[in-house]
Amino acid sequence: MAHDVFNLADLPAKKEYYRGGETIVVEAEPSDGWYVLLSGKVGVYKKDFSVAEISKPGTVIGELGFLLNIPRTATLIAQESTLLMHVHITLDDLLTNYPAVVKHMIKILAERVVKTTEDWRDSMEKVSLF
């Protein structure tokens, strides 16, 4: 049975609330699942440098460590009062029982690749002007 990614009630997950400035996960620590942003804003940091801010409800966060079974690739810090759904599931269970969620995650990853490529191209164009 396919589940809509925005109908999170059936996923093995729990809501977690963070105050502004509170750390959600720390880069290089073990990954214990992934998150869906319900409300608020999350800052993404790599080695203490801000690399992104996420504020769109429904955005999947922390999926790389989960999908690749590697430690966290970034630190996440709530930028304001933030509500997340913390999902605890095995990859096999996700693939078998929640294909709509998997499709959503693939779309997000593809969009991030496009944005990263565009940002890189823009930065290279700026460098070539000098």
Language model segments and positions:
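Short, small/polar residue-rich loop motifs at catalytic or cofactor-binding pockets
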Residues: D10-L11, E29-S31, D48
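A small-molecule sensor/coupling module
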Residues: D4, L91-F130
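Glycine- and acidic-residue-biased ligand/ion/polar-headgroup-sensing regions
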Residues: D32-G43, K47, P57-T59
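A cytosolic small-molecule/anion-sensing beta-strand core signal
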Residues: R19-G20, L38-S39, K56, E80
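Short phosphate-coordinating micro-motif centered on Lys-Gly-acidic
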Residues: Y18-G20, I24-E29
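Cyclic-nucleotide recognition modules
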Residues: L11, E53-I106
